[in-house]
Amino acid sequence: MASTEVDSRLGRVVIPALDKVIKNASWRKHSKLAHECKSVIERLRSPENSSPVADSESGSSIPGPLHDGGAAEYSLAESEIILSPLINASSTGVLKIVDPAVDCIQKLIAHGYVRGEADPTGGPEALLLSKLIETICKCHELDDEGLELLVLKTLLTAVTSISLRIHGDSLLQIVRTCYGIYLGSRNVVNQATAKASLVQMSVIVFRRMEADSSTVPIQPIVVAELMEPMDKSESDPSTTQSVQGFITKIMQDIDGVFNSANAKGTFGGHDGAFETSLPGTANPTDLLDSTDKDMLDAKYWEISMYKSALEGRKGELADGEVEKDDDSEVQIGNKLRRDAFLVFRALCKLSMKTPPKEDPELMRGKIVALELLKILLENAGAVFRTSDRFLGAIKQYLCLSLLKNSASNLMIIFQLSCSILLSLVSRFRAGLKAEIGVFFPMIVLRVLENVAQPDFQQKMIVLRFLDKLCVDSQILVDIFINYDCDVNSSNIFERMVNGLLKTAQGVPPGTVTTLLPPQEAAMKLEAMKCLVAVLRSMGDWVNKQLRLPDPYSAKMLEIVDRNLEEGSHPVENGKGDGGHGGFERSDSQSELSSGNSDALAIEQRRAYKLELQEGISIFNQKPKKGIEFLIKANKVGDSPEEIAAFLKDASGLNKTLIGDYLGEREDLSLKVMHAYVDSFEFQGMEFDEAIRAFLRGFRLPGEAQKIDRIMEKFAERFCKCNPKDFSSADTAYVLAYSVILLNTDAHNPMVKSKMTADGFIRNNRGIDDGKDLPEEYLRALYERISRNEIKMKDDGLGPQQKQPTNSSRLLGLDTILNIVVPRRGDDMNMETSDDLIRHMQERFKEKARKSESVYYAASDVIILRFMVEVCWAPMLAAFSVPLDQSDDAVITTLCLEGFHHAIHVTSVMSLKTHRDAFVTSLAKFTSLHSPADIKQKNIEAIKAIVKLAEEEGNYLQDAWEHILTCVSRFEHLHLLGEGAPPDATFFAFPQTESGNSPLAKPNSVPAIKERAPGKLQYAASAMIRGSYDGSGVAGKASNTVTSEQMNNLISNLNLLEQVGDMSRIFTRSQRLNSEAIIDFVKALCKVSMDELRSPSDPRVFSLTKIVEIAHYNMNRIRLVWSSIWHVLSDFFVTIGCSDNLSIAIFAMDSLRQLSMKFLEREELANYNFQNEFMKPFVVVMRKSGAVEIRELIIRCVSQMVLSRVDNVKSGWKSMFMIFTTAAHDAHKNIVFLSFEMVEKIIRDYFPHITETETTTFTDCVNCLVAFTNCKFEKDISLQAIAFLQYCARKLAEGYVGSSLRRNPPLSPQGGKIGKQDSGKFLESDEHLYSWFPLLAGLSELSFDPRAEIRKVALKVLFDTLRNHGDHFSLALWERVFESVLFRIFDYVRQDVDPSEDDSTDQRGYNGEVDQESWLYETCSLALQLVVDLFVNFYKTVNPLLKKVLMLFVSLIKRPHQSLAGAGIAALVRLMRDVGHQFSNEQWLEVVSCIKEAADATSPDFSYVTSEDLMEDVSNEDETNDNSNDALRRRNRQLHAVVTDAKSKASIQIFVIQAVTDIYDMYRMSLTANHMLMLFDAMHGIGSNAHKINADLLLRSKLQELGSSLESQEAPLLRLENESFQTCMTFLDNLISDQPVGYNEAEIESHLISLCREVLEFYINISCSKEQSSRWAVPSGSGKKKELTARAPLVVAAIQTLGNMGESLFKKNLPELFPLIATLISCEHGSGEVQVALSDMLQTSMGPVLLRSCC
């Protein structure tokens, strides 16, 4: 025994209570009790008497439930001794005795002195405690209010206690007792306390079950939240406070109450309900003996579910895959789960009861049971939600309870049913997919879809239910993916939205309704709230899935148009331990099964269902076409068996049309009907059961022949399945008809005189092959038919099916719903039946078998697209119509909120069409297009537009245009309200075409022409009513303005003040993300364009806002800003080129402001943002036809330079492009103004140009080059050339670009350029980009028509090259020569044609005089300069010799004497200056070029003797038609040929002279090989000339055609003589000089051949006897002259032969002697030949001959 100190603790509790018991006990009746009490008192007061009983005493060693508050415990015997008087006192039934005993027990439990487990099935200790609890429970039967509270207190303390554990029957007994007190107590406080105690106990039981621990901390419930609205109205606050104190006090008395967080807990007929037997612990068939119909239903449901579970597990058990957990766990394993299961089942059974209406107590019991279930479900934990046992309990018991209560006419019952369903959907939907698919339509949709005659209270409850359902954003999405995308489920989401729409629209006109107007209005408002909630839920879900930031965040959404990596996760129906499933708030998920449902799978499922629905819809109109459609769409197979199976199983098919189709006589229909009937198995079925089963799926057609075919096949099938029932199928056929007639007669209310059994028997006599069927058989058949009507599944249509069929119900479970909810009017007497329960069970089994029973927890946002497709049109109608028709503030607010959520969802999902539909509708409701009609609701719509812009700006995309259009219109009206003049007054001054600009300053804008007199002057322009046009800022005018409308407008303008400042839309644009700001800018530009293009009222509001938003967003990252400016750039270009001068000026001034702001930002090197920013100036400068605009641009750019020059970097490029464009302008002022600025830039800011990249310097040079072509003032051109020279000097000094600076840049001597190799300019891109534009620009000026400009340009060009060329590398020189110097001669090398006197040059040089001037002055000078430059830098550029020579050759080749002469002169000049430095290879190049020039300039007279000319002449002789024209044309051609030939002949003479000069200068430097090449060139010239001279036909033609040759002299005789003479000289000198490479034999051979050739030419002419009869001049005279001309050459040849050595002469004498002999006999034109011949004979030939004779 424990110490005395400790004993006193127990004694302080027990002894006072026992004293009271003794005091209040009757000594007669309770003497034994008193004696026990005294004994215990003495035992507790006397320590020596309270020592443990001897070990020999029974039970002394067994611990008991009592302990002393410390470590020591009382034995079981001692515990029994102490507790026995308390138990006995509590059982006396005397209030005064019972009260202290119960109070003592409560204190013992509260203080933890009682420990152990109370369970009647346990050991001695458990039995003792069980008896103690049982005794307390029975005390409430005394019917005392105070004792009731004490009992409740004790029981709640017992359940709450951690030391005392209540399980099994004891727990149920406690619940039963509290339940009984709630129903039986007459005290309201006691009732409330009993209810609160039940809730607290239930919460404790389930919380412990979830934690799997009895020590889990529990918070007291909040009593006020348990009170239903009805209870709250009937109770006063003191009751609630009293009950709350009662609960809290008890909870505080238990140890560990406050260990948990301060979370606020809102956890807020009976014998059969509290049975502890579980499925499998008793024979289920024994339960069918119950006489309580409700309990019979419950047991039947339980048995059916249990059997189904066993059947479903047989296969698993056979495979050994099922763990032995659930049943055993509940029965003997986890007692906490078992307790929770028992309590839950008990509450379900209590809620199933259908008490008589005259028994309100039992109805209250039903209600409180439902309330408890509601609380438990609302606060269900993970174990409850996912355990198979509990899910099975829900399916077994709770579903039956919902089924029974769903049609109750008591609103509280219906409300609780809805609340329970809400909990199931919210938290258990993953495990109850099939059940929710049934109960949601049954409880919610049937009420929602009944629009005309609903029960108002039920409808309001359903609407509030849907509103609560939308709180969890995951629920609607899960409903859609699991039902609307499931072929075998009803379109719950679609039906819900459509039902809400119909409710929101109200009862259709002309429809009879039971609703009062206030009721209908309240219902419409609540429906609209639900629609808003649906959209809000969808928006919340997509926000959560995509983790969208707040509306003002700049974070970019990049995953809207693609699927998330997580797909939709299928969850097995009711399996698993819970999973994430892609969402957070909903706790209804179960363990995710394998496999993901991605966006494609969702889309395919949805598309499949929609197509199937379409096919069923077609079938319900035309069955044959429907079947054809379904077969073609692969929804149904084409075999009769597959079609029959579809007709039998598919939901939504019209039963009448099925019957019609089956009765058709066509081949396919007939085969389908046979397959349909053959699919039934009638074995062992009664005849009427077979007919019932057969006719359940369709309605017999009205046509007799169709019925006959169907019933004939039925009879055949029945007899085949039951061959012994009838003798033939005829019997079954006739009996089937008879049964159908009996069914109609018995159940048709129109038939007054019913058929009797005898009548039925009589009608069927002799049908069995002449024999009668047994009378008993027929009578039983009659009874069954009369008692139970044969009907189809959808007999007794509910209100919703009386409406036209639509796709939303085609695949739903409406057939079940119509059984559950019959026609209105039967609701009051409605009772569930065995038939109903059985039917529901079949449907659940069917759903469980289908693969679609897999539950999908949606996480892929693609599903929202399909949801929007379903609901956007109803939503738009639901919000638009009330907003248009009603001015109520509440309705307006709701509609606008709905618009906002709809636009959010469609925008985030990038559903452009749907988004634009909502946005345009909302914009229309602003009424800004018709301001006279503006009301308060329109003002609210404007506010909604502003809110939309602020919160959804990141996702609006193209819809920004509609919003900004509204903003524009609003601001227009707002200004009118303030009396400000419209923007049109800014654009009032007339357009000018003169070159005089009205601008005084670059930042000026047109002044207002006249002051506005007030708002009325301008209001009329805004008054013209029009329809909303989302693409413009002006409506379409339709009516004139009345005075009343004007007054309305003035008053409405004041309403606009409520909206506030619209500018925040623009100021907050910097919070838009990178893509949204671009969409925003595009839309603003479009709206601005519409404003400015308005012919009557142009405005600049949006244009000013463009400037603002560009300013606000200028600090964005460069990449984003570039995209923004790309849009703005195109906009400013378009506006800047506007025909309205004022608008264009305003645009350019706005652009100037932006540019000034942009130039405040520093730009890093190698970036191009400034240049891009200023490009609009460039484009407008080029495109604009307005002088004022171009001048404004010049002034704007000038201002930028003057004020921001330090920050200008890449912007120089655009600036110089503008000035370059201005240089070509047709207006003098523009040119002068721009050059003035360029001059200032170069003089004052040149270092700013050169410090940037190389291209800037290049642009500057190009600009100066453009000014050198100025046609207005020669001084500008000269100054520009001077600036180019300055630029060249700076470039050479290394001031242009850091990378161009040479090392060292300056030499110590006066800054002269150093000449080190390191100072060479390389052929880098930078050097090319720098030097080439400058040099090329100067070279281009060589073609300027002004001689002075040409000279100065060439001088500057060559001075620059001469002064700085020593720093050029060879490669750079090569590029300079090719691209700069040679380009000077490109034109003349190609296009100069001396034969065309009136040719027009492509560069603008008109007439031959200008061409000749250029040739004689500029070309010659340029060639000299080129030669001089080459000579000066020969050491560097000598590898370019060949290219220079080719330049000369190309000039020589041109058929122009002056040009060729210049080329030849340059060649000679080059040879004279640097020839002495040439190597053999270089001389070879020179000689080769000379030979090429000689060959290319050969005269050609072949055309004169060609066949074409001869044909032309003969044709002229034959006809005189057009002879004059032909003659002129021929003469022109001949003149051109002859002129060309003469020109080439002259050029060849120049070539011979040049060769002679070069030979004379470098005779001793040339090798034999060089000389022979020159010889070949000269000999070729001579040979060609002789050939022409010897062509007598040619000479005669030239004479005959009137050639300019007036004599018979050979046309090219001089050329021939000079060329042969030169050849002779070369050969003679070669023999005498004998240079390097000399070959005597070769040279002598050439010389002998040349001499012989000359002599032969002379002899041929001198001795010729042929004379042409066509010669006009006597031949003798011409011959004489020719011989005279040839004489010197012949003399030279004779002398050369004579000077040969004797041996050489003797060697060649055989060849020469005949020529010498012939020459003696010839006629000579000069005595010189004879003299030379005589000398040769005397000095050379004579001695040779004499010696040979000797």
Swiss-Prot record:
Provenance organism: Arabidopsis thaliana
Subunit structure: Homodimer.
Name of encoding gene: BIG3
Record's compositionally biased regions (Polar residues): 47-61
Phylogenetic lineage: Eukaryota, Viridiplantae, Streptophyta, Embryophyta, Tracheophyta
Subcellular location: Cytoplasm, Cytosol; Membrane
One Pfam family from the record: DCB
GO biological process, one term: megagametogenesis
Principal location: cytoplasm
Limits of the SEC7 domain: 601-788
UniProt-annotated stretches for the region Disordered: 44-65, 565-596
Active site (record annotation): 703
Positions of post-translational Phosphoserine modification: 586, 1307
Origin: domain of life: Eukaryota
InterPro entries xref list: ARM-type_fold, DCB_dom, Mon2/Sec7/BIG1-like_HDS, Mon2/Sec7/BIG1-like_HUS, Mon2_C, Sec7/BIG1-like_C, Sec7_C_sf, Sec7_dom
Gene Ontology cellular component annotations, sorted alphabetically: cytosol; trans-Golgi network membrane
Gene ablation phenotype (knockout): Abnormal nuclear numbers and positions. No embryo sac.
Function per UniProt: Activates the ARF proteins by exchanging bound GDP for free GTP. Plays a role in vesicular protein sorting. Involved both in the nuclear division phase and in the nuclear fusion phase.
List of residues that carry N-acetylalanine: 2
Regulation of this protein's activity per its record: Inhibited by brefeldin A.
Protein name in UniProt: Brefeldin A-inhibited guanine nucleotide-exchange protein 3
Keywords: Acetylation, Cytoplasm, Guanine-nucleotide releasing factor, Membrane, Phosphoprotein, Protein transport, Transport
Biased composition (Basic and acidic residues): 565-588
GO terms for MF: guanyl-nucleotide exchange factor activity
Membrane topology qualifier: Peripheral membrane protein
